[in-house]
Swiss-Prot record:
Single GO molecular function: zinc ion binding
Residues that hold Fe(3+) according to the record: 80, 82, 249, 324
GO biological process: L-histidine catabolic process; L-histidine catabolic process to glutamate and formamide; L-histidine catabolic process to glutamate and formate
Matching Pfam families: Amidohydro_1 (PF01979)
UniProt record similarity statement: Belongs to the metallo-dependent hydrolases superfamily. HutI family.
Protein name as annotated: Imidazolonepropionase
Binding annotation for Zn(2+): 80, 82, 249, 324
Organism of origin: Bacillus subtilis (strain 168)
Cellular-component GO terms for this entry: cytoplasm
Amino acid sequence: MPKQIDTILINIGQLLTMESSGPRAGKSMQDLHVIEDAVVGIHEQKIVFAGQKGAEAGYEADEIIDCSGRLVTPGLVDPHTHLVFGGSREKEMNLKLQGISYLDILAQGGGILSTVKDTRAASEEELLQKAHFHLQRMLSYGTTTAEVKSGYGLEKETELKQLRVAKKLHESQPVDLVSTFMGAHAIPPEYQNDPDDFLDQMLSLLPEIKEQELASFADIFTETGVFTVSQSRRYLQKAAEAGFGLKIHADEIDPLGGAELAGKLKAVSADHLVGTSDEGIKKLAEAGTIAVLLPGTTFYLGKSTYARARAMIDEGVCVSLATDFNPGSSPTENIQLIMSIAALHLKMTAEEIWHAVTVNAAYAIGKGEEAGQLKAGRSADLVIWQAPNYMYIPYHYGVNHVHQVMKNGTIVVNREGAILG
């Protein structure tokens, strides 16, 4: 007698399950198992089977979804965002186009200090509504799991406010969120002459954040003019002692040694890495620290030097991709666009890109055993794409290829409708 399950997806043109026993590094990122003419079975929010046509034999479903030859993949994972913030900074773009430097904009109260001011002034409810709007956009582009950082408070109450908003978001809408405490995002004006005291203030928040389960990771911006390698080492060691996973904004501009520090501390991820040295790349590979690359930021800032993804992959580094969604240097929720930029400017292949936005991204935020793969027992988080094959998504840029998004086996995005009028 056939076993009854909730849903079966049939007539899948190509299926990427992204099955892996761990994050993919180096040459293994090129190994992509593509299943043609595939099926997926779902019951009680979990994957029952995902494979070649015929795997559905012995099952009957309450609902049959005909994918009509479309591509199906796991839901995408965005492992680096600054989702919770007040205000916006579109005026700065015009100022930059007029030749005004970022330092001059900062001196006028703009830049990150503008976002800090707006985030401090916003109520928790205002931040919640704004972040929810942006998160719905992320979901519409196929992101079903994401990381979110604090870091626009730079003082106790606002940092905690940002983290509370992220926790409420996680509990109230479909996208799974992993929170990172990034009080060490910048040095506020009141601490410009004493950054060590500021770091002590941020470290003092760790027990409360841990007790209230507001964040899983701690992050710091290691860069010229922000925090030194020595300061970052002390901060991250204290965070590790408090039970937090470690992340680091490393070498975005200068090869300061952030990647080497990430490797030495065995951080879960090191992010940005535009200026990382050969030695830094080697240390990341040796430590198994995941490189989260943010090419959308380089693109938006109009810079020509991108992170050296090819050198990292050749050295055996595990590479991931993220939007870095934030109001100043990467105002986009569209991870599909990031996939295209990675192909064009990081010279990553389509196979490498798919690993970078699914399984590797999931491991970069501690969700490797839950997200980024379609296999029996995993949550049924998947995307049905209006695309004939996996290479089409990074190839055809600037549009949304999502047809439907499923989260825990339920359709949460449906773009089937025709344009009216």
